[in-house]
Amino acid sequence: MTNFSISRQRFLLRALAGAAALAAGSRGFAAAAAAASAPAAAPAGALGAGQPSSTARGAALLRAAHQVFDSPRVFDDPLALAIVGAQAEAALRADPARSRQSRSLRALVVMRSRHAEDALSAAFARGVRQYLVLGAGLDTFACRNPFAGQLQVFEVDHPATQAWKRARLTASGIAVPPALTFAPVDFERQTLRSGLEQVGFRFDRPTFVSLLGVIMYLSRDAAVDTLKLVTALAPGSEIVFDYGVPDAALGAQELAARQVAAARVAAAGEPWITWFEPQPLAALLRGLGFSETDNLDPVAANARYFANRADGLALSGSTHVMRARV
């Protein structure tokens, strides 16, 4: 029977530990350190018990809550409420106090999604026609794709999570567009490369890759292998990913907040283990073969996406978002 308890990050770790196989074409996935984020706080009963990927549910609920509670919206997703379902939407609306408690985390989730889609639009404008979403969860971009018919979207996820997503799409009345290709990959049986080849992914075409909420759970070596995945793709390919800076780079308030969150995920046996400083990371990326990088820090992200708001929605953490192009 399919294991429905597998988390989104643990699934990705299995995939990305073998990312160098994209270049070598022969290596299977390596044994990965178990790592997964603690699920974001969700209303009781939201999305139903026993469903796969609590982290995918948590991120989807935060995107949905943003549509309900935040104005103006940083990330406008007209399908965010539909895909989580009427029961989850009702639970969100019935508990606005919880939305205030999750405001900072919600800001992070919607900022990184908005930034990734802004970068995707820019990549499309310069000719990129493939979008690879690693650990797509309940992401709805493919179903509201403004470039439908021109941009092919490939969503990689565990088969259980993709089956659950397809059921959610059907239940919500959201059609699966022709430009969306699901790539269910069971890393106990196949590599990421073979899974993508089976569904028609073109490794010889420039590709935009999103990798959100993963890097901090990887060992440094696995993180580097993950980034090598993109350098093995066609020139012009690009990745957007988020990461955290080391403790020494944080102020007292930020450090205290991190320690509370870190203790929670460590107690679950899934610690954050890898941090990067922006300038050394940019140098590392150039050494791997990326031709250009662009780092968005929290100060710049707040200025770009959360300026002049009256509702208090803003980043308060230490997460940066990096964009790197081959």
What is the role of each PLM region?
Residues M1-S7:
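N-terminal secretory signal peptides
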Residues S5, L12-L132, L138-A183, F203:
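Rossmann-like AdoMet
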Residues D186-T191:
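Conserved acidic residues
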Residues L192-F203:
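Short amphipathic alpha-helix with an adjacent loop that forms part of the alpha/beta core around
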Residues S210:
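A conserved beta-strand element that flanks and buttresses the S-adenosyl-L-methionine
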Residues L218-L229:
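A short, conserved alpha-helix within the catalytic core of class I
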Residues A234-G244:
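Conserved beta-strand signature within the Rossmann-like core of class I S-adenosyl-L-methionine
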Residues A252-V326:
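Rossmann-like AdoMet/SAM-dependent catalytic core
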